[in-house]
């Protein structure tokens, strides 16, 4: 049975001066998919990600977010304040650079989205600690970011992206700064924490090995989608959650109540 769309983009156009970074792009992303967006530098792949994630507004077109637990809404036309609220309440983000606050501990960083939603600090940090443990960081909750390896810090960033139970996670080159072994480990953690829990992952990557572990690959060239096909995801394990992550997912249940 085909899952329902969580993001529907239609006719997206984005210009930077004379350059059409996106040229009439349409794309439907369904619940539980892991979608790798690939393309050369300047192809428009990051601009597409940013438009889908309400980071920037396209010049024209439509983006409808209709994820589970989220009231379906048109994202194009929202002001910056409203886009920020959508990002904070309904979306998760993982970047190439983890963008963690060095003065905070791992658990304090991971708990930040919950604090922004108004959860009390003890409850927020308890939920965050559960995700850190599920991602292999048990016992490291009180370490500052400078005391973690690159792969460990990126796992903290994944916990931060997932701690609110966001139904859609966007990742921009999440393994780009890591060596091949650490990259594979972090990608496994990211897939299990998102699609392994029935959530949706949209990821920009230049790495074909990373893309092949997703369920779908979208190729962008000169601002247009030139290919869109299922990837060979036999090695991803994305469809089966680990027991620890299944337990961690329950930590996010009811946070909005």
Task: Provide a role label for each language-model segment.
Residues 163-167:
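A short, proline-enriched helix->beta-strand linker immediately N-terminal to the Walker B motif
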Residues 38-40:
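The feature captures the beta-strand-to-loop junction immediately N-terminal to the Walker
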Residues 169-172:
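Catalytic Walker B motif of ABC-type/P-loop ATPase nucleotide-binding domains
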Residues 62-85:
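ABC ATPase NBD Q-loop/coupling interface
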Residues 104-112:
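Short coil-to-helix segment of the ABC ATPase nucleotide-binding domain corresponding to the Q-loop/switch region
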Residues 53:
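Helix-to-loop junction immediately C-terminal to a conserved catalytic motif
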Residues 144-148, 152-154:
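Conserved ABC ATPase signature
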Residues 137, 141, 161-162:
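ABC ATPase C-loop
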């Amino acid at each position: 049975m085909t899952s329902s769309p969580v993001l529907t983009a239609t006719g997206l156009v984005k210009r930077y001066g004379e350059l059409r970074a996106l040229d009439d792009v349409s794309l439907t992303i369904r619940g539980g998919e892991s979608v790798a967006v690939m393309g050369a530098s300047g192809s428009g792949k990051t601009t597409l990600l940013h438009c889908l994630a309400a980071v920037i507004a396209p010049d024209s077109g439509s983006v409808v977010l209709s994820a589970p637990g989220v009231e379906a809404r048109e994202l194009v036309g929202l002001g910056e304040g409203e886009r920020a609220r959508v990002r904070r309440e309904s979306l998760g983000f993982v970047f190439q650079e983890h963008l963690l606050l060095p003065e905070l501990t791992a658990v304090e960083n991971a708990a930040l989205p919950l604090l922004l939603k108004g959860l009390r600090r003890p409850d927020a940090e308890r939920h965050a600690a559960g995700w850190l443990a599920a991602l292999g960081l048990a016992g490291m909750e009180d370490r500052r970011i400078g005391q973690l390896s690159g792969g460990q810090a990126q796992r903290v960033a994944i916990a931060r992206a997932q701690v609110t139970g966001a139904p859609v996670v966007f990742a921009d080159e999440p393994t780009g700064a890591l060596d091949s072994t650490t990259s594979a480990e972090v990608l496994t953690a990211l897939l299990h924490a998102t699609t392994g829990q029935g959530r949706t992952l949209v990821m920009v990557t230049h790495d074909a090995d990373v893309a092949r572990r997703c369920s779908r690959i979208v190729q962008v060239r000169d601002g247009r989608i030139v290919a869109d096909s299922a990837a060979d995801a036999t090695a991803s394990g994305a469809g089966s959650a680990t027991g620890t992550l299944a337990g961690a997912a329950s930590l996010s249940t009811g946070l909005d109540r």
